[in-house]
């Protein structure tokens, strides 16, 4: 849609802004209709006028027809104005003078607005010079360039079409007006009459300061008036080594005047404007002449029967730091496409490295090089002339694109291309790349400080691509001083890494590197780097928690040092649960509750954790943890109450070690001691073990060997006992033959106790495996323990009746009807212990039920602060359906924002530890990882290993 202004006498009655908005809307609708008609190959041309504005609407050919006949537009405007003036009284002398004053003021304001629009457009292109605004293209493609800051209801158009009041408003509020380039206009189109071209005989474009003499650039057509003259392309280039840059097409214009007609554009010298030929130009012939105090020669690019595109290159100063993010993305796309074409061209000529593509020669010599695999509708050309959508399609089809050299390109020698001489390319490693991309130069080879990978060429594009692809996600967080410190740390790590191989490379210089520990430098440093990234991620994750809980357990490593393991479980606002190892603290000296509290407080402070969000603490239930006077839980509750008044820290003993239950409550040490000694004696001696395996094989027993009992892997207790019981005769025979008889194996009472212990440990193993399920919720754990307690009550009743249905091993050796009665006291001991563990959950049973069964919860049992929201929730059939469909905790991710208090309550319950999985996982890692060699690691290094493992 084109828009033209005509001079009309002012009319006393002006339409309101609402009327203008209606007209603009209807004109836009009419334009949309024209686009649909064009799809059906129908041509439409329409001239519309509103107030002093003339709109040209229609299809591309229709608008071209009307734009080429400006007299027709003026006649139509005069006709409409004349019709309107018939109803207006002629102005008197006073009004006539007023009109002349307003007309003069309007012209001045329009000129000022037009200059400011040119300045804003130039600023959007990245230059301080004023650049003519392509009004017609902007009105045709309104999404390409967006003008922000205009008054509501006033569309962007040429200043000649604004009334006096609008012009004044624009100048008064010009500070808020800006141009935003969403996508640059493509190369010169064949659309005539573009209004963005400077058509005056001497039109100067200067910067607002106008402090320097402008350079005048004349473009003269080389052919007669029948050949269209295309306007300049303004290229904005950031000084760098990359050959690609941005090109923004100014509006073109088709002239039917004589060939001597000249278009002039003046640019200030202070903007460092240079006229250079495009290396990738494939446009027809033209000539650019430079007048003024310049030494640049005339530049002429010729080809048979075609014109050339004149490119004005505007160099942005080095201190230009503010760049549009969209422009940076376009630059990256062009770099990627150019790199792709270079690699494909290199493959075509038989080399394994990228080779600069001769775009001009390929274009002007069709048939020499064939490019297959280009996306449909995309023509091969230099990346500087490709649209954004075309470049993206090319990258998507990268694997399909192939260059084939049919015959040599004229003037291009390919014989020496395969012998790449990097030292002759003159590339120098720049010091600023160390801080930007963490690269250093080692023996003239760029080497990455992070992954130790080297690059063959000191080229910024290659270094930047490596950093952004592999390391930017983790290392962009280091800025300013922290980045400098990290750079020095990585440099020191690289130095040690290189020195670590000195024994192999130069053993004669071994004494020089005697102080260097290769194993520590080559292996530990990367582990610390990886763990450092994980620590930073953990800190970031903790900051997003709305509620969290901690679990504390004690571990003993291979050095017999007690390690206090602190785990954290948190929930963010999206109800995503995270369960991580927070810290491990060696416990030397006393292990009192106060000492443990100080260690925990220090660890939480290290991560800047908010105490007010702490919901619960899970512990082992030892006196140092739960002592009413000086235990850790008591100290933590006091701390939370002091930080956040009214908060009540919950305490649960969810870390259950069944081996302690068996030893302390079942009192079956007389069984375990015999089994453990016998199994370890057989398995720890290779000869004994092999002979025993052979014996079992000859006897065709169920198992080929015994499981080695380990204290740390307590789950093996049940498996060892079961396998031991089923191999009693073989073990008795083998131990007797080796002079180590076991008289207990001949005692029926001892065998019955063993059988009962086998059944009981298998039940406990089943429970604990259920508790160790990953990502368990505390309500699920509560249900599992309640179920096991109910089973204990059932077993007590069955044993009183000598019903051994749930004790199959004991049943297989039972001979008397009273055998079951002997084990009732042991069941009672276990039941008492589990009731004690369950008492912690009983205190919060209503809160847990509200979380797990919100729609069946009685309102009387709900806290008063939550009652209103729970009533609304229970009456919401949509949420009830969602609850039945997805269950918990997935349901709470769909909970609406109208239940803020209930959502916080659910987040707190969800943050409570409901599993011992992560604790048992850490036990296994400690056993497998901390060998006698790894035990020599420092505490900080061992923390890194554990954190990576968990």
From Swiss-Prot:
PROSITE patterns: GTF2I. The lineage of its organism: Eukaryota, Metazoa, Chordata, Craniata, Vertebrata. It holds the Pfam family zf-C2H2_12. One of its GO terms (cellular component) is nucleus. One of its GO terms (biological process) is transition between fast and slow fiber. It comes from Bos taurus (Bovine). This is General transcription factor II-I repeat domain-containing protein 2. GO terms for molecular function: DNA binding. Gene3D superfamilies: GTF2I-like. It is found in: Nucleus.
